[in-house]
Amino acid sequence: MRKWLAILLTVLLIPVLPASAEEESTVLTGKTAAEIVEMMGFGWNLGNTLDATGGNTDDVTAQEQSWGNAKITPELMVRVKEAGFDTIRIPVTWYRYTSDDGTYTIREDFLQHIREVVEWAREADLFVILNMHHEAWIN
């Protein structure tokens, strides 16, 4: 079950990448994992925002501030880059935005918001690590 859910989430997240990602990712062609990690440089964690489990699920941005953090903005991504970071880890907790009919379909508005956050990070010239987080229910 866990394997199938991971595959499903991967397929659903493919559209999250900006259309230009294929063109930009060609820079990594021929690089070893160690070389890519070196390119990624220092990272910053956007924790306790999209992985928070509080807030009203009617508003897909409500959870960002439910654990006391500021709202995610394009300016935040620019500040992260200006502070000297090259990579951002974006942990996301999905279960609050999935259907309860057994299909685990992720709400389109939440997927769109995740896409928006990833695009802001990419526009700030950050590598993005999109992390599935707080999903113990998958077991």
Predicted regions: what they are:
Residues 1-7:
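Positively charged n-region of N-terminal signal peptides that target proteins for export
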Residues 7-16:
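Bacterial N-terminal signal peptides
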Residues 15-24:
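Sec-dependent signal peptide cleavage junction
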Residues 23-33:
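A short, compositionally biased domain-edge/stem linker segment
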Residues 31, 37-139:
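Active-site mouth of glycoside hydrolases
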